[in-house]
């Protein structure tokens, strides 16, 4: 059979009527209605019609209108022939939350363990759907719920539902979550037992009892287990020299991949003994085979002892990096990791040398499938590596471990507090289904777009709104029915949604009242499907009235080829009339197509952006002269992002931090009395005073018992908006729009705190104030006096030293000059000798 080729788009007469009806409306309203009408009118098949938002299909046999696909707000079609499926929700299992049920029992209400469930079926005016026609066995099908079992823990409500959804329609589902008090905890400690971790093992064996006691104070339903790992017993990971294989280091056992020493159980006293008896080993390269151990610890659920209803914690302790997929090729292992359990009865990993290390994505998938929270307890040198790793593993965290693991108890306690005090909703929806979460968490304000709530306590209940939207129908009809799971991260409980996508019309299938073989309305030469003819071979035309072998009237003009009675041009001048139907011209470019009942549509004359039709193929497609945007894009040229995700602060909160509007995926910041906001998410305001002064007194009284409100009654009465969380050091995370506050109190001590307002107020204060050292006045006075005396003595001694040196130099010079002096022999000119001798010169000696 030849599918009819000439049911095209156009609605000229109808458009004139619509224009007259909405003459008093604004231009924007008129344009919106005309766009909707044109979009519907261009659809020629029932299934493409109902896959278009706001459209309905008329399967009236003698339909006189221009198009069977019309806007479903119109009354163009008799009700009994109109088909427009509606979105329907039916709750199947709706057990009450455990905390709520216990509260009702304690109050003596004796009410049902179930809240009411809704049940309905989608239908059209022409036919009813069989979506809910099947009956289920058991009480749940009869009443829409099941009785609550006293031994069952329920933390998410509802638990199961059915949903029939049309394309592009959004449906909101209310989800409630409450952490049950005393919820069971399974903690499996996975430790690196290479030689460098020997002191850590010794410390853990002494802290095992303390770890058990600490966790039992949190929940009395606590199981503890222990496993260890080294690396693959192959070069270059370990030395394969026979002697080294037996004793790779002093007091070491032979290397191994992974071993489960102690499955999870409530005999926590044996944990310390197992750790103490475990022997360290040695390897060659720096990274360890921890990923092999993680995969086996998660995949081997029964051998490890993971319970169905428990919060599952896997503490991974190491001081080194990790091998991942591909590293096994260095040792000649090319078979990829299959993600299955391969433990011997003794708990040893049997495929360590047969399979490669798992990839990060494999670890992440196993974590999601088994609701595991991994805590990477690593030394400071490796912390930055594992902080990047946790970004790719759902529900995981990284924390600093002391070099000897002495802080392991506090580390586990703090990480468990962080995990248990928050809830984040995740789902397994495919790319055809979009789920957006909204919640007000614990605040009384309006809901904001977020899938995570923090600072929860046991018993507190939060609600989420899951907005489900079917973006498009999958190409394979087998995918039109899917099961979607929504679950809190790290909790093995799911809300199951049995989704049926309304992508087809019953009248297109045999057995429907709208499906007639050799119908009279098709001249007896075709099958009527939803009111349109699917002609037999050799016949064509709107009613299969034309024969391919009879050419007498094949090219005769017909008024049905003209847009309206006033038009004198067939097929809008872009085609020719064949047997009362337009055959549109072909364009030189085969990608460019002219279409429509009167060739009035095309896919190349739409608005352009950046020289591309509808901003490019990734943003939208051109249909009948208008851009049809793909999911996530909007605007006349599909150039704007529909989602506000790019306007949401990374840490969550309000759109544009509550200080602007999101336009085309970009925040437009506002100016208020405080000042001008800026930044990518309008999170910065250099001129704003903030709330530091407002929060100061409450932080002082609650954290330090000082300040104007230090009186207990005053503090309790005035400080009800928040309770500050103590931290060792206050550091700002600019991505979360946090503000730093610093003050000095009456003791001249500096105290610091930070706050953020992402949906609700969070305050983090430094646990210890920074106070100046106390001044010892007597010591200062005595010190000054002593300093003066000592300085005086020093000056005197210095003066004495200098004078002595000077005198000695002078004396030495004097002595030197005296010793070197040469005196001439002379007589005193006034001295007279006692005797005088006179000699007569004339005397001759006689």
From Swiss-Prot:
Annotated S-S bridges: 46-55, 249-252, 300-341, 441-453, 473-741, 507-530, 522-533, 535-544, 546-579, 561-577, 571-582, 584-599, 601-624, 606-622, 614-627, 629-638, 640-664, 647-662, 656-667, 669-682, 685-688, 692-701, 698-771, 719-749
VWFA domain residues are 186-419
Instruction: Topology check: give the Extracellular ranges.
Output: 29-777
What is the first-listed, main subcellular location in coarse terms? membrane
Q: Where are the transmembrane segments?
A: 778-798
Subcellular location per the Swiss-Prot or TrEMBL entry: Cell membrane; Apical cell membrane; Lateral cell membrane; Basal cell membrane
Residues in the Cytoplasmic compartment per record = 799-846
What's the miscellaneous note? The absence of the beta-PS subunit results in detachment and rounding up of the muscles, thus the gene encoding beta-PS is called myospheroid.
Its protein name is: Integrin beta-PS
Q: What organism is this sequence from?
A: Drosophila melanogaster (Fruit fly)
């Amino acid at each position: 059979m030849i599918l009819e080729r000439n049911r095209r788009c156009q609605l000229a007469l109808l458009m004139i009527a619509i224009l007259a009806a909405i003459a008093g409306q604004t231009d924007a309203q008129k344009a919106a209605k005309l766009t909707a009408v044109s979009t519907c009118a261009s659809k020629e098949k029932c299934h493409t019609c109902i896959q278009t938002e706001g459209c309905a299909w008329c399967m009236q046999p003698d339909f006189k209108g221009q198009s069977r696909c019309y806007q479903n707000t119109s009354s163009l079609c008799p009700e009994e022939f109109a088909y427009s499926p509606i979105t329907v929700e039916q709750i199947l299992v709706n057990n009450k939350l455990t905390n709520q049920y216990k509260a009702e029992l304690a109050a003596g209400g004796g009410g049902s363990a179930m809240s009411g469930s809704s049940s309905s079926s989608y239908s059209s005016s022409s036919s009813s759907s069989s979506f809910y026609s099947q009956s289920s066995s058991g009480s749940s099908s009869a009443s829409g719920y099941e009785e609550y079992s006293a031994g069952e823990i329920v933390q998410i409500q509802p638990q199961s539902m059915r949903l029939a959804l049309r394309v592009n329609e959004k449906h909101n589902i209310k989800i409630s979550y409450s952490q049950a008090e005393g919820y069971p905890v399974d903690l499996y400690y996975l430790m690196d037992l290479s030689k460098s971790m020997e002191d850590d093992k010794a410390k853990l064996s002494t802290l095992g009892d303390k770890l058990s006691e600490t966790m039992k104070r949190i929940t009395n339903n606590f199981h503890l287990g222990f496993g260890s790992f080294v690396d693959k017993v192959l070069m270059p990971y370990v030395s394969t020299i026979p002697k080294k294989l037996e004793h790779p280091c002093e007091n070491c056992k032979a290397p191994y991949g992974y071993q489960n020493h102690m499955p999870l159980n409530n005999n926590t006293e044996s944990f310390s003994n197992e750790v103490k008896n475990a022997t360290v080993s040695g390897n060659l390269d720096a990274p360890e085979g921890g990923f092999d151990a993680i995969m086996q610890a998660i995949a081997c659920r029964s051998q490890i002892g993971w319970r169905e209803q428990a919060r599952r914690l896997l503490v991974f302790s190491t001081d080194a990096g990790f091998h991942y997929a591909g590293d096994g090729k260095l040792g000649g292992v090319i078979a990829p990791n299959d993600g299955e359990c391969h433990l011997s009865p003794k708990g040893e990993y049997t495929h360590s040398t047969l399979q490669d290390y798992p990839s990060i994505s494999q670890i992440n998938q196993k974590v999601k499938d088994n609701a595991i929270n991994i805590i990477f307890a690593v030394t400071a040198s490796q912390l930055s590596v594992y902080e990047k790793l946790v970004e790719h593993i759902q529900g995981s965290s990284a924390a600093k471990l002391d070099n000897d693991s002495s802080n392991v108890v506090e580390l586990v306690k703090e990480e468990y507090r962080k995990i248990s005090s928050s809830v984040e909703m995740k789902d397994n929806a495919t790319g055809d289904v979009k789920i957006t979460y909204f919640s007000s968490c614990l605040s009384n304000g309006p809901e904001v777009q977020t899938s995570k709530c923090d600072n929860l306590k046991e018993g507190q209940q939060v609600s989420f709104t899951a907005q489900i939207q079917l973006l498009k129908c999958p190409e394979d009809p087998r995918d039109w029915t899917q099961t979607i799971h929504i679950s809190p991260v790290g909790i093995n409980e799911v809300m199951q949604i049995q989704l049926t996508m309304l992508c087809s019309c019953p009248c297109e299938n045999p057995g429907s009242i709208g499906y007639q073989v050799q119908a009279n309305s098709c001249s007896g030469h075709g099958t009527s499907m939803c009111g349109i003819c699917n002609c037999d071979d050799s016949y064509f035309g709107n009613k299969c009235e034309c024969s391919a072998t009879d050419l007498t009237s094949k090219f005769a003009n017909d008024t049905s080829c003209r847009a309206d009675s006033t038009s004198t041009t067939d097929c809008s001048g872009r085609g020719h009339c064949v047997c009362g139907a337009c055959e549109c011209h072909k364009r030189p470019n085969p990608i460019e197509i002219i279409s429509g009942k009167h060739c009035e549509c095309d896919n190349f004359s739409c608005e352009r952006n950046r020289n591309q039709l509808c901003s490019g193929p990734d943003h939208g497609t051109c249909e009948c002269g208008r851009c049809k945007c793909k999911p996530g894009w909007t605007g006349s040229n599909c150039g704007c992002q529909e989602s506000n995700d790019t306007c949401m602060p990374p840490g969550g909160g309000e759109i544009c931090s509550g200080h602007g509007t999101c336009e085309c995926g970009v925040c437009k910041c506002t100016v208020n009395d405080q000042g001008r906001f800026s930044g990518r998410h309008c999170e910065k305001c250099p001129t704003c005073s903030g709330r530091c002064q407002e929060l100061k007194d409450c932080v002082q009284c609650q954290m330090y018992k000082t300040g104007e409100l230090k009186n207990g009654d005053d503090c309790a009465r005035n400080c009800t908006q928040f309770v500050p969380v103590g931290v060792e050091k206050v550091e700002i995370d600019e991505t979360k729009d946090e503000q730093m506050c610093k003050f000095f109190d009456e003791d001249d001590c500096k105290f610091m705190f930070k706050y953020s307002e992402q949906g609700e107020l969070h305050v983090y204060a430094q646990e210890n104030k920074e106070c100046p050292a106390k001044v010892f006045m007597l010591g200062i006075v005595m010190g000054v006096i002593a300093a003066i005396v000592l300085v005086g003595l020093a000056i005197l001694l210095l003066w004495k030293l200098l004078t002595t040196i000077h005198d000695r130099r002078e004396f030495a010079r004097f002595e030197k000059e005296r010793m070197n002096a040469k005196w001439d022999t002379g007589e005193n000119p006034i001295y007279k000798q006692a005797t005088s001798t006179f000699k007569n010169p004339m005397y001759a000696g006689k």
